[in-house]
């Protein structure tokens, strides 16, 4: 399941008023409204607990067995660890792959190997794939060897080529 944990969606301020951050406060990636969307105050224990309860109920009610987590850097690490702990209580093999924009195997926003995410999307892979089809096979092989040496069962990446947020992989080849 693809989801965002940090905001409630446009037009939902009155529904979730007691769970949202103050719109006038702007404190970096975690404590600011992003793109004008009402932001859950995930650093508050009661808000965190309610969100985790909702998300684990999706697992129980609908058989969700993994989350592809959007915009990981907009939620505090305590919340990610709480969600991961709760999901593995329901299903020990539950997995979460995070989208931490700009992350790669060498720079992942400290979400891997910390009990938060099982994997992050590897944004460096896009450049490597472009380099590969451009004929730079040796440099890509070197990158992949280094990346593979760094990965293990608690520190994994998923190949990332493009998304709705940027030009597609094929566009970079034209």
Model-predicted segments: where are they?
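Substrate-binding/active-site clefts of carbohydrate-active enzymes
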Residues: 1-62, 82-98, 106-107, 130-131
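Active-site-proximal helices and loops of the catalytic beta/alpha 8
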Residues: 53-162, 166, 170-174
